[in-house]
Amino acid sequence: MKLSPLSFSTSSSFSHADGIDDGVELISSPFAGGAMLPVFLNDLSRNSGESGSGSSWERELVEVTLELDVGDDSILVCGMSEAASVDSRARSVDLVTARLSRNLSNASTRIRQKLGKLLRSESWKTTTSSTAGERDRDLERQTAVTLGILTARDKRKEDAKLQRSTSSAQRALKGLQFINKTTRGNSCVCDWDCDCDQMWKKVEKRFESLSKNGLLARDDFGECVGMVDSKDFAVSVFDALARRRRQKLEKITKDELHDFWLQISDQSFDARLQIFFDMADSNEDGKITREEIKELLMLSASANKLAKLKEQAEEYASLIMEELDPENFGYIELWQLETLLLQRDAYMNYSRPLSTTSGGVSTPRRNLIRPRHVVQKCRKKLQCLILDNWQRSWVLLVWVMLMAILFVWKFLEYREKAAFKVMGYCLTTAKGAAETLKLNMALVLLPVCRNTLTWLRSTRARACVPFDDNINFHKIIACAIAIGILVHAGTHLACDFPRIINSSPEQFVLIASAFNGTKPTFKDLMTGAEGITGISMVILTTIAFTLASTHFRRNRVRLPAPLDRLTGFNAFWYTHHLLVVVYIMLIVHGTFLFFADKWYQKTTWMYISVPLVLYVAERSLRACRSKHYSVKILKVSMLPGEVLSLIMSKPPGFKYKSGQYIFLQCPTISRFEWHPFSITSAPGDDQLSVHIRTLGDWTEELRRVLTVGKDLSTCVIGRSKFSAYCNIDMINRPKLLVDGPYGAPAQDYRSYDVLLLIGLGIGATPFISILKDLLNNSRDEQTDNEFSRSDFSWNSCTSSYTTATPTSTHGGKKKAVKAHFYWVTREPGSVEWFRGVMEEISDMDCRGQIELHNYLTSVYDEGDARSTLIKMVQALNHAKHGVDILSGTRVRTHFARPNWKEVFSSIARKHPNSTVGVFYCGIQTVAKELKKQAQDMSQKTTTRFEFHKEHF
């Protein structure tokens, strides 16, 4: 085998007369270098006789360059040169030699023997043509290089020992945990000792179920200790622990498992570090090479489902070696890995996320409010509660008062009628409930008149009416309708009808005119117009309300076939159209009222006529407008994360605001289904774009129709700028109809000094348009070189509003909009389709107007050993190249879920005395947490957070 070239030279001082003693060992280099071995030898004494007694011998040094082949016992002399030496220089070289001494391998011993024989031969007595000055300079240079390398490495090692402290070790513990909340479960909240005992009991229980004949297989170790989704990583931990026992195990007993468990759950940093080191050090030589780091990186990437990182493991292994092994030894030791982990915070600070340094001034104490008394706390809490809910409160109060007034009015009216003497309070209760039903059947249509609401959003009514809660109000009214039906129908069937049937002749005379003088039977009452329409309405509304519930509409209810068709959006959509029949029956039912003969007493049509006409007009407008807004599909792209990107032609006269949404219909799939999607293009763009996550049956069918037989791997938004989409193909696609745009909470983003935009997965789409609009306006401002200070007009759809905001509620100043965007996704591939947005911000956001924060939840949190190495590679690569290893942009991707309390606290510190608009699109569970944090921070700081959730 060939010896690699050495990166330095050594010299040996001895008398030529004595030759080379076989006992003298050649120094093997710890450095990784080439097959060139510079050896410094003492040559012949020039004039031994010239020296007087007691004088020093002037020695001559010879530098010999050899190439050795240990395999075939051959040696090649590549070069030879003389170098002058003095005693002081020789002593320096001897000092270097002493520091470099170490045990030789078999190969180095054979080299020494070869050199000994060779140097004794007469051929080595040849003198060279080099001058004494050149030899002297060469020696100085080689000695300086050697000393520099050794000094630098030793200094780094000494510095690492000096900087190691308890506090740094404690911080490092958070970055190297084999057992944490992901393995022990979130329910464990007690102290560690108690927690560890509880966890071991769970491990014991899993051992009993997984073991066979009292032995646990190596492949089941991960599941047993809680690393369910990281089988390969757990096996590597298993092998590392087994190597400590000098064993190669395939199965372990319960006692051995307990020993392994104690090691991986040890709270000592040194213990965890040693396990992590042993995982990489597969050959147990106390050194980690580039290949071993690569293998550990691939294990970590596999455990975190990062296929792209797995492909680039070799590149990132070289990056780690470059950082930890600057001397190019070819390996790293335990102390170097320890240094990397202990300096985790320094690496993280060295690699900052994009635009985080700009923005408001951090005032950690000045914006905090610390009420001293309970009264002050309650007053502040009440104040925030009123500010957050006063719009909802007055609307609900007016609604409840209207229902109460109508109920009491009818109750008192029928108490004065003769029928009250027959049926008593059952009649008054039923009629009072009926009156509230008329009101609610009218009001329930208004929140779904989207065109009307969109227009009202542009008026001053938006200041006092919570249009964002239209769907919630629709649901509340529906619940009131259900209660009204129950009271009205229940009292009639259980109380009124039996009293009529069982009334005495004297009592029946009082109400005989309502029944044409004939006492009805129960069958007569049920088969009359009132009974048939009433029962039919109860049945139809029950079906519609049930299938519109969250569990049925979102497919959370699992039913056997063919009943499974009763769940999902389609079932909700079609059964809701049964309410058309209900309204027709309601008019008929209200016409054939008992005990009401005059036309003005039959008021049902008066309640519902205006809302019904308005709703019918809106549906008619949708039908007409959709034909006018028929669009051409310009580009279809299937993006990572099952996201379908559609770029369509912009219909003539189609105007919208950032944050609004549209309804899409594909007649090829269904002529009746309309589905809402947020607009992701900016108002100033020439195209109209949406991004659709293929989850339901309609979106799956849309993807099939648009992508069948076509290669759609191009990531449009990731490879083209917002203002000009590249290579748009005019392809013969199915027809799409567009209805809208419709108002959404996000369109009011200009009302705030600061924005906090939070999107989960595909929930980022409502905010893409806002970010584009902010950047487009910023670009226009730079071009025009002017700063708009006029009040923002709500009637403008293509706003000239740039970075100015309306007058701040705190102090009257107009402040530049600062946007903090948090995107949380669990699909590593989803980052690809959002890359264009991040790259555009990198290019255009020179003012630091927008902060981007990406969170990838498929990666274990920063405290998990499975993500520790990935986190370090990410920080090193970002610090060196300025690019994130996951997103491919300057925006660094965070791991696991955000700590929302810290997010809100940070924004409150940066923006004291400001109003922050919090806009969220995602699942309801996170919405509750965000709303709570917004309320808490509004009470504790001078920053006010106003929370808004997207509803479709």
Curated annotation (Swiss-Prot):
Family, similarity comment: Belongs to the RBOH (TC 5.B.1.3) family.
Species of origin: Arabidopsis thaliana
GN (gene name): RBOHE
The EC number(s) this enzyme carries: 1.11.1.-, 1.6.3.-
Record-listed Ca(2+) binding positions: 281, 283, 285, 287, 292
Annotated InterPro entries: Cyt_b245_heavy_chain (IPR000778), EF-hand-dom_pair (IPR011992), EF_Hand_1_Ca_BS (IPR018247), EF_hand_dom (IPR002048), FAD-bd_8 (IPR013112), FAD-bd_FR_type (IPR017927), Fe3_Rdtase_TM_dom (IPR013130), Fe_red_NAD-bd_6 (IPR013121)
GO CC annotation, single: membrane
Coiled-coil annotated residue ranges, if any: none
Alphabetical list of CDD domains matching this protein: EFh, NOX_Duox_like_FAD_NADP
Tissue-specificity statement: Expressed in roots, inflorescences, leaves and stems.
Domain (FAD-binding FR-type) ranges: 626-748
Function: Calcium-dependent NADPH oxidase that generates superoxide.
Protein name in UniProt: Respiratory burst oxidase homolog protein E
Subunit structure: Monomer and homodimer.
GO MF, one annotated term: oxidoreductase activity, acting on NAD(P)H, oxygen as acceptor
Ranges of the Cytoplasmic topological domain: 1-392, 497-531, 596-603, 772-952
Record-annotated membrane-spanning stretches: 393-413, 476-496, 532-552, 575-595, 604-621, 751-771
